[in-house]
Curated annotation (Swiss-Prot):
Protein name listed in UniProt: ATP-dependent dethiobiotin synthetase BioD 2
Amino acids binding ATP: D13, V14, G15, K16, T17, I18, D50, E115, G116, A117, G118
Binding annotation for substrate: T42
Record's function text: Catalyzes a mechanistically unusual reaction, the ATP-dependent insertion of CO2 between the N7 and N8 nitrogen atoms of 7,8-diaminopelargonic acid (DAPA, also called 7,8-diammoniononanoate) to form a ureido ring.
Organism name: Haemophilus influenzae (strain ATCC 51907 / DSM 11121 / KW20 / Rd)
Length: 191
């Protein structure tokens, strides 16, 4: 049975997808079999956009599991939080369906890197947040952060939330995306 590692971030657009793809590639280079999974994807149709990015970084084609929908059991067209996207499409997100997909992947691969949607506290369904899901499944976490304004606060709050809930944080990955405002970097006293 493979090891499942959950990858989440301090916010949306913090670079979780890039970090997930890079970590998957690193594990592959170490000789491990690895698959990435997207818990829920909003803002696209059919194959989850984030999986396409993962596969490009990994240097592989879409997998059989991608084409079967196992690596992203829920895809919604409207770009918003998962619970709202599901509501707009009159669908219900069930944790058991995601868990079943993850378990099937873990039977085949050494590592399953399960990427969340948005930040830790985003509701993935009407009843629960991503943090609830991580805690319920006792997944270890890689937290992705960045250098954007407010990230120190968001990172510390996220780590505190994990500590309070007994979630094991394997590492904090700093992602250089988005890039710093060049004016602030070159002339920090200009503002």
């Amino acid at each position: 049975m493979g090891k499942v590692i959950f990858i989440s971030g301090i916010d949306t657009d913090v670079g979780k997808t890039i970090a997930t793809g890079i970590y998957a590639k690193k594990l592959m280079e170490q000789g491990c079999s690895v698959i990435t999974q997207k818990m829920i994807q909003t803002g696209c149709k059919n194959i989850a956009d984030d999986l396409l990015v993962h596969r490009k970084i990994q240097g592989i084609d879409l997998t059989e599991e991608d084409l079967q929908g196992k690596t992203c059991p829920y895809v919604f067209e409207y770009p918003c939080s998962p619970h709202l996207a599901a509501k707009r499409e009159s669908r219900k997100i069930e944790a058991k369906i995601i868990e079943k997909s993850t378990a099937l992947l873990a039977e085949k691969y050494d590592y399953v890197l399960l990427e969340g949607a948005g930040g830790l506290m985003v509701p993935y369904c009407e009843e629960a947040t991503t943090l609830d899901y991580i805690q319920l499944n006792n997944y270890p976490l890689i937290l992705v952060t960045s250098g954007k304004l407010g990230s120190i606060n968001h990172t510390l709050l996220s780590l505190e939330a994990c500590r309070t809930r007994g979630i094991s944080v394997l590492s904090v990955m700093y992602n250089g995306y988005p890039e710093y405002d060049l004016l602030l970097v070159k002339k920090p006293n200009a503002i």
